[in-house]
Amino acid sequence: RDVERSRGLGDVYKRQDKDILYFSLSKNISGNYNSARVAADAVLDDCNNGRKIRLVDSLNASLGQGLLAIYASEMREKGMSFDEVADTIETYPARLNGVFTVGNLKYIARTGRLSGTTALVGNMLSIKPILRGSKDGYIVQFRKCRGRKAVLNELVNLLCDNITDPENQIIGVAHADAYEDSLYVIEQIKKRIKVRDVINTTYDFCTGSHVGPESLAVFFMGKDRELGA
């Protein structure tokens, strides 16, 4: 994988002759960052043409990475230099929250965060967990709700109660085959706060395969990633 990543990064680096700003999955849930670091070092050793490669640990996954890329693009369009953009965007992950729930607890059990028995009983009782990214980029269980509607409403509450400067923010909603639920969450958010924009999308295949069908996440900037914990 590192060799393949190195070749791909090298092709972009040589062909486009541009600086590269790369947003990785949280390095505490994936080897993505370390693989990218190996690839970047190999590319620079092989064909350093004066262009820069900078890596940012998103402390997130899915749309958490995507929002960072969008904000970075907007900074560039405003005339900021590559290093100015990179230096600024590196401060964002510490405030970019990713909070999510899953449709079936068996997917949490597969990660080792629950036993199979607990997952089975939880599904029978319609227990819905809320998980979040910790300040260090680990996935931690945060709260529990009873029933699908209750957990969706709690995601809305967490976003609306912890978001900062919402009128200048883009918030993200990512889901795995839960489009109607995503529309409900967005509707409830808009009833409570005014935001600059909302992105509603499906999970990427990698994240989606880990969290399973009917999973749904919200992403937003807060003062930190603690959410009152």
Annotate each predicted stretch with a short phrase.
Residues D11-Q16, V43-N49:
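Short, charge-rich binding segments
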Residues S26:
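Active-site pre-Tyr helix/loop in NAD(P)-dependent dehydrogenases
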Residues D19-L21:
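Structural motif
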Residues I29-N32, A36-A42, N48-R54, N60-I70, ...:
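Mixed-charge interfacial surface used for oligomerization/domain docking
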Residues F23, V56:
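Hydrophobic residues at beta-strand termini and immediately following loops
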Residues D2-Y13:
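Single conserved hydrophobic/aromatic residue that forms the stacking wall/gate
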